[in-house]
């Protein structure tokens, strides 16, 4: 779908879900259907609850991320749906703060030449990670990853509509104009 046109319309059961440039649907999907339709592997989706006391979003009872003050409006909800693109889940390093590391057990791994895709289970959901390059990762290994709040798409769990788009997307576009080097 990303290469089929300048603008696309995504339908689900005959109902228009979103119209726009493919990259806009990819970066700012209006709902989880659009999020999981566009992209390979698709966006990871999971249920989340909010802790109003600690001002954290808790994904799958395991991943706890602090909510920045500018996003405190999210605390008005009890539960949300979160999404993150596989390429936005990062590898933890020795410099990564211990509280930011999330240890996951590898369920499957594919080294595809210029990238490595592996999966892990977060509650009942299988999530995918896509890293550039060739990584020596074995099925059954436990590895540390990092999920940043800024990388999340957050959807209202009742309306399924996007209420927070990712804010850390790398964009290499200059005013929709051709770049001459």
Give residue spans per PLM region.
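ABC ATPase "signature
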Residues: 11, 16-21, 28
């Amino acid at each position: 779908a990303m290469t089929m046109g300048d603008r696309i319309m995504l339908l689900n059961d005959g109902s228009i879900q979103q119209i726009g440039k493919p990259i806009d649907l990819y970066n700012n999907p209006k709902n989880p259907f659009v999020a999981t339709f566009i992209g390979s592997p698709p966006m990871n989706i999971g249920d989340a609850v909010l802790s109003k006391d600690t001002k954290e979003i808790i994904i799958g009872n395991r991943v706890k991320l602090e909510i920045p003050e500018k996003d405190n409006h999210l605390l008005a909800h009890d539960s949300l749906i979160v999404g993150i693109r596989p390429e936005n889940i990062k590898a933890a390093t020795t410099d990564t703060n211990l509280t930011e590391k999330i240890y996951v057990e590898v369920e499957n791994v594919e080294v595809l030449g210029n990238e490595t895709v592996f999966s892990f289970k977060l509650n009942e959901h299988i999530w995918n990670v896509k890293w550039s390059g060739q990584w020596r990762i074995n099925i059954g290994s436990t590895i540390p990853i990092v999920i940043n709040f800024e990388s999340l798409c957050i959807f209202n769990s009742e309306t399924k509509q996007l209420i927070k788009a990712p804010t850390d997307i790398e964009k290499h576009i200059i005013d929709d104009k051709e770049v001459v080097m």
